[in-house]
UniProtKB/Swiss-Prot annotation:
It comes from the Eukaryota. Disulfide bonds: none annotated. Component of the mitochondrial small ribosomal subunit. The lineage of its organism: Eukaryota, Fungi, Dikarya, Ascomycota, Pezizomycotina. This is Small ribosomal subunit protein mS23. InterPro entries: Ribosomal_mS23_fun. It is found in: Mitochondrion. The gene is RSM25. Belongs to the mitochondrion-specific ribosomal protein mS23 family.
């Protein structure tokens, strides 16, 4: 029995192994000829025969998604599930690294029958029925060009990226025209994201200005409170020196008069 993390990892064929050993007959030294010895079945054999153990406690080797290293003499982590990597992962990572703001766009992930991807024909371009334009459209279109047109990853990405920019510009123009037409008939629109962001930035800047002014006032007050202390001592020292010089000059004048 092998124990790992306080779990019993019994072999799946434990019952079959013990059963086959019990069915084996053998003779012990000193036994009379024709007499065979049988093993005594363990007490748990009948219970395991009626209620076989589940296989959740076993450790089957997971499906290998990549070829093993032939140079590795001691394979490691053979029981650990391997990472599932798809071809689209690298394309998706590249696109969202170059266009991080696409992740901020709201998306509807609700599907009709779970087979929406089968209704798409990526040979016709990025615009597909009932599927809004998004980064996933770019990934699927690029993947189709790589598999069917024989393009490299960079060339397909550059071509699809230009198509994506053109469609985004069309959407922006349509949205702007619709907003202008609605305002002409009296519609009112609130602040957009850019205006809200500018106001938040201005508010934070004004708060920082107040804090900086307060800190400067505190520093100026501390400096003013410290200056009279040192200045007073200097003035007292200068006054004492002047008094001494004045007294010395008066004494000299009196001595001259006496002489």
């Amino acid at each position: 029995m092998q124990r790992l993390r306080a779990r019993d990892l019994r072999a799946v064929d434990l019952y079959r192994t013990v059963k086959s050993n019990l069915d084996t007959k053998f003779s012990l030294p000193g036994m009379p000829p024709g007499r065979e010895h049988r093993q005594v079945p363990p007490p748990w054999l009948q219970a395991m025969q009626k209620i076989p153990p589940s296989e959740i406690l076993t450790r089957p080797i997971p499906i290998q998604h990549q070829k093993p290293n032939p140079k590795a003499r001691k394979p490691k982590n053979i029981f650990r599930p391997q990472k599932i990597v798809y071809e689209e992962d690298e394309l998706r990572k590249t696109f969202y690294r170059d266009h991080p703001w696409e992740l901020a766009r709201p998306r509807v992930i609700l599907e009709i029958d779970g087979m929406d991807s089968h209704y798409c024909d990526w040979s016709q371009g990025l615009e597909q029925p009932s599927i809004p334009l998004s980064g996933e459209s770019v990934v699927q279109r690029q993947l189709w060009l790589m598999h069917n047109e024989g393009m490299t990853k960079e060339k397909a990405y550059d071509l699809v990226r230009r198509e994506f920019y053109a469609l985004r510009q069309e959407e922006e123009v349509e949205r702007r025209i619709a907003q202008e037409e609605a305002r002409m008939v009296g519609a009112y629109f609130g602040k957009n994201r850019l205006q809200i962001g500018n106001e938040l930035e201005d508010h934070e800047y004004e708060r920082w200005k107040d804090w900086a002014a307060t800190e400067m006032a505190k520093a100026e007050a501390e400096r003013e409170n410290a200056m009279p202390t040192f200045g007073g001592k200097a003035k007292d020292a200068e006054a004492s020196i002047d008094d001494l010089m004045l007294e010395g000059s008066m004494d000299a004048i009196l001595e001259e008069k006496k002489a």
